Amino acid sequence: MAETYLGNPNLKAVGQNVEWTEESIKEYKKCWEDPEHFIQNYVRVVHVDKGLISFDMYPYQKKMINTFINDRFVICKMPRQTGKSTTIISFLLHYILFNESVNCAILANKLATARELL
C-alpha cells in the first residue's frame, strides 16, 4: 500500500502510523484549544503575486472567529471582497478536524463556487 495519499508527499495514506513527540502533542493541543492559532499557523491562501502564503487575519476576521465560537447562530452583514469566505472556511476546517462525528456543508449560489471553496 502507498504511504501517501494520491501521490502527495504532504498527505499520509489511510492507516499510516504517526509518531507523536511531546512537542507535537503540545502543538496539537494548542491548535485544538485555539482556532486562531491553528488558522494563523496552518492555513495557507494563494496570493496573486506571492503564491502560497500564511493567512494573516485582520482584527475583524479574528472577531468573526470568536463570534463563531461563542454564538450558535451568526449573521455577518459585511461588504464584498473582505475575506469572509476564507475566514469561514478556515474556521470550518478547524471545526471538522478537531471535533468528532460532525457534518459540514458548503452552500453557494452555484455548484462551481461551492467546489472552489472546498
What name fits each language-model region?
Residues 2-118:
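Phosphate/NTP-binding elements of NTP-utilizing enzymes
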